[in-house]
Amino acid sequence: MTFLSPTSLETRVGQMVFVGFEGLTAPDYVLERLREGRIGGIILFARNVADPAQLAALTDSLQANAPYGVIISIDQEGGTVARLREGFTESPGAMALASARDRERLIEAMSGVLAAELRALGIHWNYAPVVDISYYADNPSMGTRTFGSDPETVSVLAAAAVRGFQAGGIATSPKHFPSAGHTSIDTHVALPALDTSLEHLRQIDMMPYRATIAAGAASVMVTHVLYRALDAEYPCTLSPIVVHQLLRGELGYDGVVTTDCLEMQAITNHYGAAESAVLAALAGIDAILFS
């Protein structure tokens, strides 16, 4: 299939936008915006999935309506966060895999199996692995999604996941930079504002990012948490300091940087949709995600 290259400013900006939708088939407004080049990517959820045949037909239809091409993405971490379940290959969550014998090899192999299935279904990008360090057992948004509380272990296992997925042709997105592990506040419902020191973030929380970047991570997802030591005004997702100075500058990352979903209340309680999208772009974000 031959794709066009975006030429107008509107289509160039549109290629930064990722959206979700309700239902097992794409609504007309999504297909229209794809044809116009005003959407660059789609994020799939369980609400879009019935079985493998239906999902493959859905991704085919999205591509058929996208002259500029469309990137299909999903959260398929395994365990508690998996959009593909019955009829698909299921994986244990990160913490369970981290408890297994020969865990590094197992995680790389399991990621490769999942990657092969995702590619066959027409999916390109998996928002995984979670590389947050587990600090609180009652962290409502983390739970067993993390590889654990030891930064060296998390680094080794997260890098294995990146290698496995990307060897199978699926882009990964270690998340949530620089960390969503320091709070018991769920960013789906509120904006955490924390006093964690920059030195701690550098020495501990950014260790898995150094490892996954070295492993070739195609993208990094930025958290909605506000760290006062980094930027007292903006949450990380909307912060040029975090994206440009810390991720791009200090870590030397030159891959794709994506927001977490801008419809989470950590953002919507403080910013409108258009405002948050513009601020994210100005911060240096490449992919702007709405669900």
Provide a role label for each language-model segment:
Residues M1-I39:
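N-terminal basic, low-complexity leaders that serve as flexible interaction/assembly modules and, when applicable
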Residues S8, G20, A26-Y29, R47-A66, ...:
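Second-shell residues forming the walls of enzyme active-site clefts
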Residues E32-F45, V113-W125:
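Catalytic domains of carbohydrate-active enzymes, especially glycoside hydrolases
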Residues A82-G87, G93, A137-N139:
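Short, conserved acidic/polar surface loops in the N-terminal third of protein domains
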Residues F88-R103, T146-G148:
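A charged helix-plus-loop insertion that forms the helical arch/lid used to bind
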Residues V131-S141:
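Short, conserved phosphate-binding/catalytic loop or strand-edge motifs used
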Residues S99-I123, D205, A214, S276-L282:
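Alpha-helical scaffold segments that flank or form the walls of functional sites
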